[in-house]
Structure formats: C-alpha cells, structure tokens
Amino acid sequence: MGDFNLALVIVAIVVCVIVFISSIYLLVNYQHPDDANQAYFPKFVVVFGLSIAMISILMLPADVANRHACRHAIYNGACNLTLPMKDLWLAIYIVDAILVFFVIPFAMFFYEGDQDKTLGKRIKSALIWVVTTAVVCALVLGILYGVIGKVDFSVRHLASATSTFPTSWQFSNTQPCIGNTARQCSAFTANPTSEKTWTMRTTFPEYVVALATIVGSVLFTIFGGVGIACLPLGLITAFIRRPKAVITRSQYIKEATELGKKARELKKAADGLHQEERSGAKGRKWRKNVKAVEKELLQLEEDVNLLEEMYPQGEQAETAWAFTVLGYLAKFILGIVGLIVSIAWVAHIIIYLLVDPPLSPFLNEVFIKLDDVWGLLGTAAFAFFCFYLLLAVIAGAMMLGLKLVFITIHPMKWGATLMNSFLFNVGLILLCSISVIQFCATAFGYYAQATAAQEIFGHTLQSLRGIKYLYKYNVFQIGFVILAGLTFLYYIAFGWRRKKTSGRFQLSS
C-alpha cells in the first residue's frame, strides 16, 4: 500500500496547485476594470484566502482517502507516507482565523481608505482598526481559554469480576477456559450511576478553531439555511420571469429614457452622500441612505441587463437572443438539479441528524456505494455536496443583503467586482468554511468515521465546556431546516411574481 500512500501525497500537491491557479482565474475574470494594475495587496489576500477556503473544503474528502491509505483502514500512524491530517487541519484553520479577523479587515480598511490620504496614513488608519481588533480578540480568547477552555467527556466506569486460571490446561467441552456460568462481562449491566465526567484542558489551537466555528456556525445557519432554498429557487424563478419575446424599438427607447432618468437621480443622491461623508456626518440616517442607494443601484443594473436582453442590438442580434434563451434554459436545468440537491440535504439532516436514532445513513450509504463503483466517485460526490453548501451561503447572504437594512450588499459580478466586495465574500467564505466542514463531518459521520476531522469537530468541539449544548441539542441543524422551510414558503408565495418598477428615488430625510 506504500505506492498508494505516495500517490495520495502527489495528488494533494497537484490539487493545491490547481486550486491556486483557479483562484487567480476567478480574480482576473471577476475584478472590476478600475482595479486593474493596482490594489496588489488586496488581490494577494483574495487569491490566498480563496485557495485556503477551497483547500479546507477538499481536505475532508482527502481525510477520508487518507484513512483508507493503510491496508484494512488501520489508523494512519501504523503506516508510512500518509498525510498528517490533524496537524494540517489545525494549521489551515489557524491561518483561516488570522485571515478572517486580521488580514482581510486590514485589507478592506486599506482599500476603502480615503484616496486623498497618503499611503502611510492609509496604512496607519487600517492598522489602528486591526490592532484594536487584535487586542480585543486576544483578551476575549485568553479569558475564555483560561476560565472555560476545557472539555468534559462523559465516560462510564466499568468493572468486571475475574475468574481464576485453571490448574489443569487440558481443555475440553466439559472443562472450558472460562466457566459455563460466565456468559457475559458483569460490566455490561453497569447501572447509570457509573457514568463519570472526565475533564481535561483542550489545546489553544483547538480552542481557537472551536470559537471560530461557533461564529461561523451562526452565520452558516442563517445564510446557509436561506441559501439552500433560494439558490435553486432563484434560478427557477429567473426562468419563470424571463423575457418571452423581443420588444419594439419604441418600447426600448421609452424604457431606456426611464432608466436614464433613474440613473441621474441615483448619481445626484450618491454625490450628496459623498459630501456628507466628507463633512463627517456619518450617522444612522446616512448609513440607511447608503444602503438604499446600493439597493437601487443593483436594481438599476438588473433592469439595464434585462432591457439589453429584450432588445439585442448589432449585427449578431438574433444570435444574442438565441444565447439569452439558452441561458435561461440552462438556469432552469441547474435550478432543478440544485433543488434535488437541496431537498437531499434537508432530508438527510432530518433523517440522520435530527431523528434519534437515525432512520437511515441515507447520503452516507450513497457515497459508500459510489466508492464501490469507482474509488474516487464517492469522494467526488462528497466534495460536491460540501461545495454546494458554500454556494448556498453566498446565495443566502446576497438575498438577505437585498432584504435587510443591517446586512451589507457585496455582489459578485463577472468583470465588475470591486476589491472590497471580493474581500468581504472571501472573508464570509473562509468563516463559513470551518462550519461547513464541521457540519459535513457531523452529517456524514458514518462515511467520514475515524478521520482527523471527526476527532477535532466530532469529539473535542461537541464536548467543549460552555458550547457543547448547542451541538447536543442540534440548535444549528434545527435553525438551518427552519430557515430553509421559511425561504421555500416565501418563494412559493412571492418568488414567481415580477418585480414592479420603483418610482422616483428619494433619500430619507
């Protein structure tokens, strides 16, 4: 099996290189033209953060493959050339936490700093915010680790009577080694009072990962629960509300005139808000108005794109309309596939996690059977389900960002994504990726058993003092399913309706 172990190491290195190249590809194709040939530090953070996020998701399938690298699934320490998965997990998530709480905020403060200031002043301003955050986080982590940084494992004290060795070593049916009356170990019938609590202090890296997981789990429950429903249903409703035919030139001119008027109103409002920002009047009303302008701007861009789809121009107008029709058809197909995956996810959570004892291994058994068909087929399906949860988080964040005032909108658009939106979404992905891994390690516990991820997330995290009850009573899983159900009902009731064009835009006074 040594050759297989070496192959696993080589595959891991190749995958890391592919992930790094993919991150650069996403940055180059999604970045805004205004950020071309500048903002190199934020771009480095984006590429590095995306790579860490994708690698962390792929590490769980790698952990499962690593477990099988030894003959008869012997634990990894019993053979050579396997990956040190526990050390890799801790390293990845410590880097993850540093990026989320320190590096990405610094890059965002630096990027969004006043361009009229010198480079030194922008760095100084960003450092002040980050150092303040670092001091607060260090104090909170230190106090919590010192006071409640322990794990409480429930164990059962077992005791059994012993039998004396026989004086004669001539065994037969009438003279066995153990007497006929010794049918079971007496500890098997131990009473409930024999249960004890074994307390020990966890390591600091594991504690940091645990707290980061809690923060990520809250966001994952909210955004993921909403996104698991709105991701496929959003694609399906886009197909339902698609333009059915090309409009006339007069209709196009009328709609374009209205959109131009709306654009001038938004520009005037944005200029006014910029003047207020310069004067230091950044109160609650200012933030509310900024949110309103962002929302209207996104709606305006969506209306412009829709108008261009309904009235294609140029020599290839017919071809453009054909691609528009095919694009909406692709959205419908992807929406149906996504809906099947979302239903499978929610059903698996209910069947395997919320019902005690589980009704069925469900997706665990599917992955195992796929592995029997071809070695990496189950692993690939496993990775796909994990990645789908991350996509659901992004979709949920976008939907809630458009509906709720206190959530900032950071859309990701091909060729039009500013670096602050890139950084925000990378931070969200990194923070939620920890929770996605923990969630998958729990949801697919039967398939991912005896892995390093289960040791960290399945035992230590769920026994950590102060937060173990969140996992004991499935708080996050229940919240996830409830939000998914509410979002589904929302789309059934309102999602199919066409959006009404808003009237004249005005700032709140």
Curated annotation (Swiss-Prot):
Membrane-protein topology: Multi-pass membrane protein
Location, primary (coarse class): membrane
Family according to the record: Belongs to the LIMR family.
Pfam family, one: LMBR1
InterPro entries: LMBR1-like_membr_prot
Transmembrane segments: 8-28, 44-64, 90-110, 128-148, 208-228, 332-352, 382-402, 422-442, 475-495
Keyword Thylakoid on entry: no
Localization per record: Membrane
Signal peptide: none
Residue runs in coiled coils: 251-316
A cellular-component GO term for this protein: plasmodesma
Keywords: Coiled coil, Membrane, Transmembrane, Transmembrane helix
Protein name, entry field: LIMR family protein At3g08930
Statement: the UniProt record of this protein carries the keyword Membrane: yes
Species for this entry: Arabidopsis thaliana (Mouse-ear cress)
